[in-house]
Amino acid sequence: MNIPSDRLYTDTHEWVNVSGDVATVGITEHAQRELSDIVYIELPKVGERFNQKAVVGVVESVKAASDLYAPVSGEILAVNTQLVEQPSLINSNPYGEGWIFKMKMTNPDELSSLKDAEAYQELLQDKE
């Protein structure tokens, strides 16, 4: 399974790619596999503010619906509007074209509570 080492990960299977004070967020390959074919996504609105671990949206698949959580506190700067018409991009390219939103972090210290790729791999192995 692909777990890029240039990102951080949450226990709820979101990934975070940090550039300065901007965090790009998506769901992991593991999460999209568990959900199966993604058919709909409810995106947050640009300008909305969320605290860490708050529900920011929903990902729906043919199997289930799953909440999407803010990995850090911040304000939504951009959402991937391509996902409205093509939610399957999350399945085909979860770490690239399937990114979900970008947020300006208001408390970058919260990044220390996230997992690196190795710790996320261990989390997945513990669940098997």
From Swiss-Prot:
- Cellular component, GO annotation: cytoplasm; glycine cleavage complex
Task: Note how many cofactor molecules are bound and how.
Answer: Binds 1 lipoyl cofactor covalently.
Gene name, per UniProt, is: gcvH
Q: Which family does it belong to?
A: Belongs to the GcvH family.
N6-lipoyllysine PTM sites in chain numbering:
K63
Give the required cofactors.
Answer: (R)-lipoate
> Which Pfam families has this protein been placed in?
GCV_H
Q: Which NCBIfam families match?
A: gcvH, PRK01202.1
**Function, as annotated:** The glycine cleavage system catalyzes the degradation of glycine. The H protein shuttles the methylamine group of glycine from the P protein to the T protein.
What keywords are assigned to this protein? Answer: Lipoyl
Q: How does it assemble?
A: The glycine cleavage system is composed of four proteins: P, T, L and H.
Q: Where is the Lipoyl-binding domain?
A: 22-104
Which SUPFAM superfamilies is this protein grouped with? Single hybrid motif
Question: What is the designated name of this protein?
Answer: Glycine cleavage system H protein
Kindly state a single biological-process term from the GO annotations of this entry: glycine decarboxylation via glycine cleavage system
